[in-house]
Design a protein with these regions (language model features):
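Membrane-interface alpha helices of multi-pass inner-membrane proteins
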Residues: 50, 114-115, 127, 159-173, ...
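Transmembrane-helix signature of polytopic, membrane-embedded enzymes
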Residues: 97-120, 139, 336-343
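Hydrophobic, aromatic-rich transmembrane alpha-helices
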Residues: 93, 188-190, 264-287
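Transmembrane-helix motifs of polytopic, lipid-linked glycan transferases
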Residues: 17, 84-105, 142-143
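Membrane-interface transmembrane helices that cradle and orient dolichyl/undecaprenyl
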Residues: 144-162, 331
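Signature aromatic-anchored transmembrane alpha helix within multi-pass, membrane-resident enzymes
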Residues: 12-16, 207, 273, 282-283, ...
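Catalytic lumenal/periplasmic loop and adjoining terminal transmembrane helix
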Residues: 214, 340-462, 513-516, 521-524, ...
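Hydrophobic/aromatic-rich transmembrane helices and adjacent perimembrane loops
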Residues: 127-128, 135, 179, 267, ...
Length: 601
């Protein structure tokens, strides 16, 4: 029996780490939203400022923000590590879930199954990775339920007061976890059949919680008064009080949306497992406690929301723990030989459904800026239009994922931008007339080299690299072929890739051939590529078809001989009449132009 228990414990631990690994590996697919940026901004200074800000400038309880401030000081303050903090909290939550399954239902399998079900549940997954209080909300709610059940079993004043401490912790963590306390009270009244002694103990526990929370109580009252004033001023007020701007009304559509989110978009599957568990476990009081956790909490929240503006799905994420336990009980009610198979099918469907719960309208700023950072060069300028100083998420992402020099170069002045050779033209309003006008002013001298992002019916965010020629003044072949410089793109032992920049004032009369040559130190020809302009590498343009004033970028690749010796080589450019071989001369009489020296590895 001890050996079985130890194996179950080790399996539970393994499942916790598997879920944690899955969540950590998924961080790269989660993207910052407005509230997460606020979490960083309000914890940027010292701890006293963090608490002061929540007390006087916001409407939140202080524990999570204080703990996040501490996490940032000692662990790290990147977006990734911010999400790791939430994963750390979920690991502790899942460890408690295992204990609940083992003790409430006398089945380690219930705890193990609940861990895996929660790990694949989109509701738990989404808010378990947010840089907001929700992961810790789930932790303290689970701890409170654990202590509440422990008191119900032992019925001692000590366990009651211990439970009371968790209630105080919940109030300091997030005000709306109080819905769980209401669910606990309902269970006590309708299922536990409390004795007079139990009522005295629970009242004592709640009084202790309020006593501990009382120093913050005036702050909470002030927050409510401030909130009412602000909501009324902006016309967002809904109900007697609450947060009208960030909550939603209790409607049938809102309820269906919550059900869809809680069930990972599979309400039929969850309902089936719920019915199975209900048939086989309805006599167990512990089952009704998790049912109230899973269903009672949202019912209470939605009812209260009809009077006070207190509901949005993220405020009651802790109900997901109850849902996971209800599902685990349902699956373990099946014949033992098919329980693991049923779990695998359930988890697989849930994992498959997770992507469907994410909005396709999310702009993946981090990915876009990281691409820019890889391509950025010294001297680049970031030109943003329109400039929205209030878009804090964008500024946070830019400051953390662009190179420091590029972020410092940020401007919305097109004249200042043109002082640089390379401009990163950034816009979230591509079809705006002013944006189009300024883009078209830049484009003749700064042709687009690369486009990062997209503009589609779901979202629009474009970052376009616009680049001027390397030289401010040309070197002209003959009288018709001004050459504006060279960019050496890559050099390897097998090839050299080069961009040649051309712009003419008038269309040449002839179709010239352009030759890019590679010479060794003795002046011997090693490699050569001849032909018309290969514009952007995909359009052949004869010189007698060039449009005046348009910049042409000739993509050239020199294939090097296999036996080439490593060393320094000279690039050389010629322009000639391909019919006669006669070269165009430069002003100094030279029939060639020396370009860059390159080192062949």
């Amino acid at each position: 029996m001890v050996q079985v228990s130890k194996r179950a414990w080790l399996l539970g631990l393994l499942c916790v780490f598997l879920v944690a690994a899955f969540h950590i590996s998924s961080i790269q697919n989660r993207y910052m939203r407005d509230d997460e940026e606020i979490a960083f901004r309000t914890t940027n200074q010292d701890l006293s400022y963090t608490i002061w800000y929540q007390a006087t400038q916001d409407v939140h309880a202080p524990v999570w923000f204080s703990s996040f401030w501490i996490w940032r000081q000692f662990i790290g303050d990147s977006e990734f590590m911010g999400r790791v903090y939430s994963v750390f909290a979920t690991m502790l939550t899942l460890a408690l879930v295992y204990q609940i399954g083992r003790t409430w239902f006398k089945s380690a399998r219930v705890g193990i199954f609940a861990i895996l079900i929660l790990g694949a549940n989109s509701y738990f997954f989404t808010y378990g990775l947010e840089i907001r209080p929700y992961a810790v909300n789930m932790l303290v709610a689970t701890l409170s339920m654990w202590c509440f059940y422990r008191w119900l079993k032992r019925r001692t004043l000590f366990t009651a007061l211990l439970y009371g401490l968790t209630v105080a912790l919940m109030l300091y963590q997030h005000y709306f976890i109080v819905f769980l306390v209401i669910a606990q009270a309902l269970y006590l009244l309708f299922f536990a059949r409390p004795t007079r002694q139990m009522l005295v103990q629970i009242i004592g526990a709640w009084l202790l919680a309020f006593l501990i929370w009382s120093p913050w109580f005036p702050v909470a009252i002030h927050q409510v008064e401030t909130l009412i004033s602000i909501e009324s001023g902006f016309g967002n007020a809904r109900g007697v009080a609450g947060i009208g701007s960030t909550t939603e009304p209790t409607t049938l559509n809102g309820i269906l949306t919550l059900v869809n989110l809680v069930t990972s978009g599979q309400p039929g599957l969850y309902l089936l497992v719920l019915v199975i568990g209900l048939v086989y476990a309805w006599r167990k009081k512990s089952y009704w406690l998790v049912m109230l956790w899973a269903i009672g909490v949202p019912v209470v929240a939605l009812l209260v929301n009809m009077v006070f503006s207190v509901y949005t799905p993220r405020y009651i994420t802790y109900l997901s723990i109850g849902v996971g336990l209800v599902m685990a009980v349902g699956i373990t009610s099946l014949p033992r030989r098919i329980q693991w198979l049923a779990l695998i099918v359930f988890v697989a469907i849930s994992l498959w459904s997770i992507p469907s719960q994410f909005s396709p309208r999310i702009i993946k700023y981090r990915d876009l800026y990281q691409q820019v950072a890889k391509k950025a060069e010294a001297g680049d300028v970031l030109y943003v239009e329109p400039m929205n100083s209030g878009d804090n998420v964008v500024w946070w992402q830019m400051s953390h994922y662009l190179t420091p020099d590029l972020f410092k170069s940020l401007t919305n002045d097109p004249n200042q931008a043109q002082m640089a050779r390379r401009i990163w033209f950034v816009t979230n309003d591509w079809f705006n007339q002013d944006v189009q006008t300024n883009f078209k002013k830049l484009e003749p001298n700064y042709p687009v080299q690369q486009v990062i992002g997209d503009c589609n019916p779901l979202w629009c965010y474009l970052i376009q690299l616009m680049e001027a020629p390397p030289s401010k003044t040309p070197q002209t072949f003959g009288t018709e072929m001004p050459f504006w410089g060279t960019d050496v793109i890559s050099v390897s032992h097998s090839s050299v890739d080069v961009h040649l920049w051309w712009k003419v004032d008038r269309t040449p009369n002839m179709s010239y051939s352009i030759g890019l040559q590679l010479l060794d130190s003795a002046g011997n020809l090693v490699a050569q590529a001849d032909g018309p302009i290969n514009h952007y590498g995909n359009e052949t343009v004869d010189t007698n078809a060039m449009q005046p004033g348009k910049i042409y970028i000739d993509y050239r690749s020199l294939a090097l001989p296999s036996g080439i010796t490593a060393g320094t080589y000279q690039l050389q450019l010629i322009v000639y009449d391909w019919q006669t071989g006669n070269r165009l001369l430069q002003a100094d009489g030279a029939d060639h132009l020396m370009l860059d020296l390159i080192n062949i590895p």
